[in-house]
Amino acid sequence: MESTLRSGAGQPGLKLIETLRLGSSPARLALHRARMAAGAAALGWGFDAAGFDRAIQVDPQAGLRLRLTLDAAGRFEVTQGAVPDSGPQWRLSLAEARLSSTDPWLRVKTTNRATYDMARAALPAGIDEILFQNERGEVCDGSITTLFFDRGAGMHTPPLSAGLLPGVLRAELACPEETLLVADLPHVRLWVGNALRGLIPAVWRG
């Protein structure tokens, strides 16, 4: 996996991304830091943990949504904005594009995310989030969220082996992994979420 990532680590404009909410717990901030550090290691980039901590010391009055990027030269860049209103429930549908469970780029959060961005830009009317499946019909990620589900035995989440990002909220909740097929989506209780928005109840619209 790392050899594939490192061979593409020099593509122009590539950056690692962490999007976090100011005021998050130290434990959650540590998860963001650890994920960016792991991504940098996979790409063969340097990572300055103290620089990460300095970069997120910003004025919350400029917005609680903080997007931190890291480039190949080790430079951090911060942008701030308002946290989007998520609403009480999200309506879910399925993307036409499929992901490959063996694609190593799905495991690191970078600006190399055109498949996700295009799907989100083309959300159908009445849909809040689009889900992806892999080549086996297993549910992976949403375009900006992790999926969580309950068949009646407690909350679970799809396994990393399906081809998805190790989300910070996912790590924080530490739900058991379980494979979920697209055919199962109408029959389970659903949530989506990320570290910025938290956990959002969801409903399958097909």
Predicted regions and their residues:
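Glycine- and Gly-Pro-enriched alpha-helical subdomains that act as flexible
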Residues: 141, 146-157
